[in-house]
Amino acid sequence: MAKQVRKASKKTKLKVPSGVAHVQATFNNTIITITNPAGDVLAWCSAGASGFKGARKSTPFAAKIAAETAARKSMDYGLRQISVIIKGAGSGRESAIRGLSEAGLEIKLLRDITSIPHNGCRPPKKRRV
């Protein structure tokens, strides 16, 4: 008769005291990814994943709600302090940072790594409304 082998749970909750929040703010959406210092993803959320669709995804309010949701998910791992890396020129930049701090995370560092073209691709044409 075969022996019963007891399987241990492979997934264990990590305890990460500090991490990195990557905020990518585009003109259409805001994506917040929270990682540990090594770069492994702990939690993520976007304005679209928070329930906003269409033009409402690009609002600062949607970015704040997405940041608060990502922060709450990451606090399950014991996260308390974060460094924030911001990329992009969207409207949800500042409100995403405000949402992270209001959720209870202490912000240690702010870095802006928005790329600036040295006359690279042609930008989109100006809107005529």
From Swiss-Prot:
Keyword Cytoplasm: no
Coiled-coil segments: none
Biological process, per Gene Ontology: translation
Domain of life of the source: Eukaryota
Gene Ontology CC terms: chloroplast; ribonucleoprotein complex; ribosome
Cellular localisation: Plastid, Chloroplast
Molecular function GO labels: rRNA binding; structural constituent of ribosome
Keywords: Chloroplast, Plastid, Ribonucleoprotein, Ribosomal protein, RNA-binding, rRNA-binding
HAMAP family with a match to the protein in the record: Ribosomal_uS11
Quaternary structure (record): Part of the 30S ribosomal subunit.
Record family assignment: Belongs to the universal ribosomal protein uS11 family.
Name the UniProt record assigns to this protein: Small ribosomal subunit protein uS11c
